[in-house]
Curated annotation (Swiss-Prot):
It comes from Avena sativa (Oat). Associated with resistance against stem rust fungi. The lineage of its organism: Eukaryota, Viridiplantae, Streptophyta, Embryophyta, Tracheophyta. Residues 1-21 form the signal peptide. It comes from the Eukaryota. Pfam families: Thaumatin. Belongs to the thaumatin family. This is Thaumatin-like pathogenesis-related protein 3. GO terms for biological process: defense response to fungus; killing of cells of another organism. Keywords: Antimicrobial, Fungicide, Pathogenesis-related protein, Plant defense, Signal. The gene is RASTL-3.
Amino acid sequence: MATSSAVLFLLLAVFAAGASAATFRITNNCGFTVWPAGIPVGGGFQLNSKQSSNINVPAGTSAGRIWGRTGCSFNNGRGSCATGDCAGALSCTLSGQPATLAEYTIGGSQDFYDISVIDGYNLAMDFSCSTGVALKCRDSGCPDAYHHPNDVATHACNGNSNYQITFCP
C-alpha cells in the first residue's frame, strides 16, 4: 500500500509541476452593469460598465464556466437577475439560463476552452487564451459556439496560459 501511495504522490507532483493557475481577465464593455458568475471558481460579483476584474483559477480545474448576468438586483447576497440567474444567489454554485457560457478545463500541457449557447444566449462575448484562437459570439447563431452537445467547438491552448473574456466586445 505504501508503494502505491508513493507512486500516486509522485504522479500528482509531476502533474502539478507542469501546470499552474490561470488568470482570467473579465472586461465589461457593455453600456450597463454585468454581474459575472463562475463555477467552480469565481462565484459572482458586480462589474460596472468599462470595468475589468481578474479571477485566478487553479490548475486542475475542469468543467469550469463563466457567464455574465444582466438585470440583477441583490441585497445581502440574495436577489435575482433577468438573465443568467443562479437560484437568486450572488455567489453561484450552478449556472443559470439563458446565458452565453465561457467553458474551460485548466491543467497539464494543454488547456481546453469554448463558448456555449446550448443553455441560451444573453450577451455578446469574446473568449481567448494567450496562446490560442479568439472565439467570438455576437448573437445566438454564432459559429464559434456550441449549439448542441454533439457540436465540435472546443479549442486547445498551451498549458499555463491566461484568458480574456469580454462582454459586449
